[in-house]
Structures are given as C-alpha cells and as structure tokens.
From Swiss-Prot:
Descriptive protein name: Co-chaperonin GroES
UniProt source species: Dechloromonas aromatica (strain RCB)
Keyword field: Chaperone, Cytoplasm
Main location per the UniProt record: cytoplasm
InterPro entries: Chaperonin_GroES (IPR020818), Chaperonin_GroES_sf (IPR037124), Chaprnonin_Cpn10_CS (IPR018369), GroES-like_sf (IPR011032)
Subunit structure: Heptamer of 7 subunits arranged in a ring. Interacts with the chaperonin GroEL.
Lineage: Bacteria, Pseudomonadati, Pseudomonadota, Betaproteobacteria, Rhodocyclales
Family: Belongs to the GroES chaperonin family.
Places the protein is found: Cytoplasm
GO function terms (MF aspect): ATP binding; metal ion binding; protein folding chaperone; protein-folding chaperone binding; unfolded protein binding
Protein's GO biological process: chaperone cofactor-dependent protein refolding
Length: 96
C-alpha cells in the first residue's frame, strides 16, 4: 500500500463481521451495517505536545481495532477502500 499517514492518523482496513445469525439466518449485504472493526495497515509518527515533543501512537500495524460507525474518512488506495482516522477515533484494540 502506497500511503504514509501523517501525525496521529491511522489507516484501517475494515474486517467483515459474521454475516450469519446464531439461528443460521444469512444477513444480506444490503441489510447489514458496515463492520465497526478493522486491521491497522499503517500509522503516522504521532502528534506533538505543546513543547513540540512527539507523542507516539498506542496502536501498531497489524492490530485489530474497534471504532465508531461514523469514524474516519473512506478513501481508495491502490484500488482498495480503507479508512483514514485519528487515533482518538479508535475505541480499543482486540486482544486474542
């Protein structure tokens, strides 16, 4: 992927959630909501504090993260749709 995020921006690829209910009903794409979790593809260097010191991000490439329904800006890079969001839009990291 040819994109390098700036400051506290994070590039996230949506990860599709399970499309079948517990009772076996398949949910069509048109009826389901967009997934609210994804995989971090790239991270920026971090933002700067009031003294100019750079603050590193908590998330790293490969993390599986949770984010809000309306978080980030969808863009296409190399034909692939990804989200560009601030680290503060990420609610948490899923731990296996």
């Amino acid at each position: 992927m040819n994109i390098r995020p700036l400051h506290d921006r994070v590039i996230v690829k949506r990860v599709e959630a399970e499309r079948t209910t517990a009772s076996g009903i398949v949910i069509p794409d048109s009826a389901g909501e967009k997934p609210d979790q994804g995989e971090v593809l790239a991270v920026g260097p971090g933002k700067r504090d009031d003294n100019g010191k750079q603050i590193a991000l908590d998330v790293k490439v490969g993390d599986r993260v949770l984010f809000g329904k309306y978080a980030g800006q969808a863009v296409k890079v190399d034909g692939q749709e990804v989200l560009v969001m601030r680290e503060e839009d990420i609610m948490g990291v899923l731990v296996a």
